[in-house]
């Protein structure tokens, strides 16, 4: 994750402040040309003493096939993917496609990448199993294909190279246990998920239900989750409908959680902010600090886990290693903005382990005044890279 200084720790290789200080013209001279051509090379990794093992030696092309790319989380994730791929001098090109939330376009994008002979393709398959035939075809055409985060079914080694994911159920469970404690085991909650049927939201819902067992927590709204497509405007519409239907909403969970606050849905309806469990965003800590400064007894509380913009790093590693003859035999270690280090994957892992960012009940919060509300506070990017990514265009 992003450090307050320009110090980053990527996949177990610590880049020192002295090395970063030299990240000028001479460093860029050793940077892949394709990376220098993306927003003047701002996302390019600093030089390392040893080429990471996952890079291999074969010259390859790399692509990220996104099912939907038009939100801040995806832009920060893309920036992290560019940064990770740029660590390998043998990567010759980078392509990013945006399915725009349209399954057929996502399929066409992937088919096009395979037809062009892209060697390593990371896929965020928002449409889930509907993407499997195209993923299988790309794999059979010779590309190393790594779907990540959203499950597509199929078999590793037969339909795609590997699947890289995270333990979404545990995220839901941790959010739920926190909410049970914060509400003293009683209250009305709703869960805002992603697209219909997405494995991420389904698994988080399982974790939430497990955490609520034996309590008086009541699940309101659509189950297993309110469909929002991870679209802030859709989230605002869903929240307005929930507010109109339910006179009491004590807690809300959300995958893309920042819009719960930034939409202004609750203040506009003259309703108190609910307690929130979700993925980290700068708006949470900064809002909490502001409200506490105004009134130390303000009831607003929240918890977040890392939004895992860094999850793509492991997917990139596996895709490149598979295409270029490398090995994923080093840990993936993330440093947060307070300088705390988190080992999110051990050598050979394909599933990352998340960690808690904020817990306002413990007065442990992240608020970076340099960043806008929508920015993640655990992205694995520098502040400058995060700001650049939020301008879009990746």
Give the ranges of each region predicted by the language model:
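Low-complexity, intrinsically disordered/propeptide-like segments
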Residues: 12-13, 22-26, 390-393
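C-terminal segment of classical bacterial N-terminal signal peptides
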Residues: 18-27, 281
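A residue-level marker of the well-folded mature domains of exported/periplasmic proteins
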Residues: 2-3, 28-394
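Long alpha-helical scaffolds
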Residues: 14-15, 259
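Bacterial N-terminal signal peptides that target proteins for export
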Residues: 2-13
């Amino acid at each position: 994750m992003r450090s307050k200084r320009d110090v980053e720790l990527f996949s177990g290789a610590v880049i020192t402040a002295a090395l970063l200080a030299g990240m000028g013209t001479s460093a860029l001279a050793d940077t892949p040309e394709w990376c220098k051509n993306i927003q003047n090379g701002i996302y390019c990794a600093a030089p390392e003493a040893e080429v990471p093992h996952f890079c291999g030696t074969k010259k390859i092309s790399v692509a990220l096939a996104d099912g939907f790319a038009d939100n801040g989380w995806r832009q920060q994730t893309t920036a992290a993917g560019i940064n990770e791929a740029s660590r390998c001098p043998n990567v010759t090109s980078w392509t990013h496609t945006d399915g725009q939330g349209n399954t057929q376009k996502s399929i066409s994008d992937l088919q096009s990448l395979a037809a062009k002979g892209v060697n390593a393709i990371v896929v965020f398959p928002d449409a889930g199993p509907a993407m499997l035939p195209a993923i299988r075809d790309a794999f059979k055409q010779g590309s190393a294909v790594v779907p990540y985060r959203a499950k597509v079914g199929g078999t590793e080694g037969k339909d795609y190279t590997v699947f890289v994911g995270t333990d979404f159920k545990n995220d839901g469970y941790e959010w739920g246990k926190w909410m049970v404690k914060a509400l003293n085991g009683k209250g009305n909650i709703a869960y805002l998920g992603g697209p219909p049927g997405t494995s991420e939201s389904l698994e988080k819902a399982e974790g939430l239900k497990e955490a609520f067992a034996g309590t008086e927590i009541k699940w309101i709204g659509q189950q297993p989750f309110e469909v929002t497509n991870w679209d802030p405007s859709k989230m605002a519409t869903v929240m307005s409908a929930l507010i109109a239907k339910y006179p009491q909403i004590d807690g809300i969970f959300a995958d893309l959680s920042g819009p719960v606050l930034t939409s202004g849905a609750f203040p506009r309806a003259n309703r108190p902010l609910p307690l929130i469990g979700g993925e980290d965003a700068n708006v949470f800590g900064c809002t909490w600090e502001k409200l506490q400064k105004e009134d130390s007894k303000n009831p607003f509380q929240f918890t977040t886990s890392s939004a895992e913009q860094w999850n793509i790093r492991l997917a990139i590693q596996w895709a490149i290693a598979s295409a270029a003859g490398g090995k994923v035999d080093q840990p993936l270690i993330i440093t947060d903005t307070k300088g705390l280090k988190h080992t999110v994957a051990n050598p050979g892992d394909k599933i990352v382990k998340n960690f808690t960012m904020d817990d306002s009940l413990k007065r442990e919060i992240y608020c970076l005044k340099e960043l806008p509300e929508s920015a993640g506070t655990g992205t694995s990017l520098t502040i400058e890279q995060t700001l650049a990514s939020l301008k879009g265009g990746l």
